[in-house]
Amino acid sequence: MNMIHRFMGCIREYKKPTILTLLCMVGEVAIEVLIPFFTANLVNEIKGGAELSGVVRVGLGLILMSLVSLGCGALGGLYGSRASAGFAKNVRHDVFTRVQSFAFENIDKFSSASLVTRMTTDINNVQMSFMMCIRIAVRAPLMFLFAVIMAYIMGGALATTFLIIIPVLVIGLLLIARKAMPAFRAVFRKYDKLNESVEENVRAMRVVKGFAREGYEKQKFAAASHDIAKDFTFAERVVALNAPLMQFCVYFNLIFVLFVGSRIIITNGGTTIDVGQLSAMLTYGMQILMSLMMISMIYVMMTMSYESFVRICEVLEEEPALTDPASPAMDVKDGSIDFENVSFKYSAQAKKFALQDINLHIDSGMTVGILGGTGSSKSTLVQLIPRLYDVSEGCVKVGGRDVREYDLEALRGAVSVVLQKNVLFSGTIKDNLRWGNENATDDEMIEACRLAQADEFVRSFPDGYDTYIEQGGSNVSGGQKQRLCIARALLKKPKILILDDSTSAVDTRTDALFREGFRTYIPETTKIIIAQRVASVQDADLILVMDNGHIADMGTHDQLLASSEIYREVYESQTNGGEQDEA
């Protein structure tokens, strides 16, 4: 019931076409059920030698009723299409909005391919089910009910024969659903895997071609596609049993009614039931069985779509891990940062902390460098500052206030993060830069690009700042992408700027120009630089050496050379390596 209530809420502004669809279906069914009644009278009048004018009058009435029924059906289809399209639009909007509210912790529960499948294939299935529900799911039960009532009015006990076959039909449908539902559930899960494989392949196409792995990727895709085809074929084979089951029920019932009705007419000479009534009974029998067939179609469709409903509900019912407090602080005073007894793990069930016992104070305007090996939790540390995750123990403060006390948008507006994986979106360079500040002027964008050492190469493009960036920034180099991402971050004019290994694709000269520009033009901004090169952070006011989730050492470059074995080893290996390269 909770699932039904949730999806009914997605009708919203499309209540009117939904209600009109239902009313049209009621009108169509009511007229369709009355037509056999008048047809029976027409047959009896013709058999009894009625005047032609009477026959014509009844015939014209039947034609008019048929046209009205046809009109109701057409309008029902029109309103139903509008309602189902609007319903799907609202479901898609609600799912996308919910995903946008997720923290990294929530997103970690779903793969990106799974979310794409849920917002496309699953919502399309739900839309089809909704369309069937407001049309056929109303039409079929009403037709069954009205036809049974009219059959009893016209045929009395003979109408009971229509109900004999229903238990057979119900048992058959339940057996079909019992087999089909698990099969469709498996199909949708494998769709996630297939989409994940496609997404991964497209994104890494250069790597695939660089290693000549096209054959392997084809085999992997073919195997995933074959698994889906196999499971889907099994599910469809089970569902296909519905059609012969229904045909058996329809033909058996019609033959049985025709046999019993004919015997009654022959035996009683038409005193109990006449030819017109028998013809009407056969029509009502068809309507009853057709309504049951439609109900079985709905049942099969809902069996196929149930897993889609469940998967969409999983997203809609996922509570965002991070929420704003009741009375959030809206202003970040400065760029000072404090870590007080901070420990963190990515899930409550994890046995090991990713960060443990972190205590650190950073004054506003400082430049802080972070070094450490792979897996030392450098990125994890800085992701706690804009509250991409919540700490497990202790607290992180920005501007002297716990980050959990801020409005999330206000906090993240004061913190610019350039992540390891640089992302550009389809659109012009200007469009991408305005992600940092949608109201930025051309002069502000140029200034940010100059500071990020991007202005020169942008101007080298024929269209300059209006150059179109392909999806994922595939038409610019890695270093150019990094510089554009840094410029975008600078446009926010943040109080804290975090560069998470964001200069790895640029040369040492450009890296040095970054640092000089930051010192000169944004001295009030707190700058945190994660790097692999000691040269990138050696001028920092404070350098942290991370090791296995702990701050192993901290100090200036000279202090760490004297006191930190880890730092000294890294520095000497890079210095000696550079000397050997030059030699």
Regions picked out by a protein language model, each given a short descriptive name:
Residues 12, 18-75, 79, 152-157, ...:
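Transmembrane helix-loop-helix hairpins at lipid-water interfaces of multipass membrane proteins
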Residues 13-16, 101-105, 121-134, 138, ...:
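An intracellular "coupling" helix at the cytosolic face of ABC transporter transmembrane type-1 domains
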Residues 23, 27, 31-35, 60, ...:
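Hydrophobic alpha-helical transmembrane segments of ABC transporter permease domains
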Residues 23-24, 31-44, 65-112, 116, ...:
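Juxtamembrane helix-loop junctions of ABC transporter transmembrane domains
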Residues 51, 55, 146, 150-164, ...:
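Helix-loop-helix
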